[in-house]
């Protein structure tokens, strides 16, 4: 990642970032902002923006004070970044690197949200407990079990910390990760990151259903933020779930799913629709007329199920998963053409938020074992993070685990 002429440590980066003169953009594109402080972190139930930069970090320092200082610095920076504050270099410090990386100067907040999470490795791997945090690890915060057919790349999976930056302007999202990476210098190092474009789900009732790179509407039956009962039951950690520091938080699971376009593009329209279980143009379930028609899993025609047993919509349905649901908030991605193959390296960067990771695990087991979509996709990266609730004003993300 581009880090500028020189990295800035946590203390220096924070002091310089907040010490310049604040200027607000005068452009008219990408306005609007979401407050950083709330009962839950932003970027979860917030209306899904069009662009994402997801980054994970490994903590290189062994001092718990460095970790807490980093989280404090990140929180302070996040408050300013999400408000759209922009900083100019001090005219008296022209011999020093500028306080802000600069690529967002003149841009508005673009509804930027920053969501932070803690990976299992932060709480100790095997017998190692470098920060004395093992006692705070939620029992369910473990790497998901292996799933049939996946081909995970370890260098693009896992991580001690994650930051999800979402915005209507991709440069604003990039700028946020760039700034936070710069602040982390000397305490944590970027492990891997993923750029995403074009949301693949709707998180509020006012949003229309987008299409994924396979051309199908995606996330029709997603949980909506206005459905507070469903959010409470399926997304937000409750006081009885434990540990206390995760109450009002959630668990993030990310999966990088490559689409095998050579296979998919050669599949007939009927084959594609039977693979998904929906009509490609309208998004209606097979046997239905409109996108939001009830998915009838019992309907037959000519003695055959209208929605096949291995259709994605059947296997992912709450009706076949003991009522389990997850909040999807993924994005499309495209890296480049693979050298010598002519194949496009593109697909879905799947992100799901859930009250308990077992919700995702149970659903994914069914999909991995039986989903017709597996012939057209391959999972190449995976990560899980505990996302605590929003800190209180003046506090910092995850502060209670250091008390």
Each predicted region: which residue ranges?
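Long, histidine/aromatic-enriched segments associated with O2/redox biology
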Residues: 3-403
């Amino acid at each position: 990642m581009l880090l500028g002429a020189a990295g800035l440590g946590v203390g220096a980066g924070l002091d310089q970032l907040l010490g310049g003169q604040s200027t607000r953009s005068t452009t008219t594109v990408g306005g609007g902002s979401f407050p950083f402080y709330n009962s839950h972190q932003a970027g979860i139930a917030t209306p899904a923006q069009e662009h994402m930069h997801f980054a994970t970090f490994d903590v290189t320092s062994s001092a718990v004070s460095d970790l807490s200082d980093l989280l404090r610095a990140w929180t302070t920076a996040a408050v300013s970044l999400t408000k759209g504050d922009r900083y100019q270099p001090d005219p008296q410090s022209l011999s020093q690197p500028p306080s802000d990386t600069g690529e967002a100067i003149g841009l508005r907040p673009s509804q930027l949200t920053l969501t932070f999470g803690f990976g299992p490795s932060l709480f100790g791997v095997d017998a190692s407990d470098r920060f004395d945090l093992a006692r705070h690890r939620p029992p369910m915060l473990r790497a998901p079990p292996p799933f049939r057919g996946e081909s995970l790349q370890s260098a693009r999976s896992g991580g001690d910390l994650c930051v999800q930056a979402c915005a209507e302007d991709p440069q604003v999202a990039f700028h946020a990760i760039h700034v936070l990476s710069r602040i982390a210098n000397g305490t944590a190092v970027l492990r891997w990151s993923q750029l995403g474009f074009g949301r693949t789900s709707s998180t509020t009732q006012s949003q229309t259903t987008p299409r994924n790179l396979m051309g199908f509407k995606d996330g029709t039956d997603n949980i909506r933020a206005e459905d507070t009962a469903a959010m409470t039951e399926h997304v937000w950690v409750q006081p009885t779930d434990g540990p206390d520091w995760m109450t009002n938080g959630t668990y993030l699971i990310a999966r990088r799913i490559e689409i095998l376009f050579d296979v998919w593009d050669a599949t007939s329209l009927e084959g594609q629709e039977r693979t998904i279980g929906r009509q490609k143009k309208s998004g209606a379930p097979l046997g239905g007329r409109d996108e939001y028609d009830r998915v009838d899993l019992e309907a037959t025609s000519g003695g055959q199920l209208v929605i096949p047993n291995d259709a994605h919509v059947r296997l992912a349905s709450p009706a076949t998963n003991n009522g389990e649901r997850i909040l999807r908030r993924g994005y499309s991605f495209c890296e480049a053409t693979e050298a010598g193959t002519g194949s496009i390296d593109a697909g879905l960067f799947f992100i799901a938020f859930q009250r308990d990771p077992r919700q995702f695990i149970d659903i994914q087991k069914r999909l991995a074992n039986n989903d017709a979509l597996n012939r057209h996709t391959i999972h190449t990266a995976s990560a899980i993070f505990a996302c605590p609730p929003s800190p209180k004003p003046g506090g910092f993300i995850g502060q209670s685990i250091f008390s």
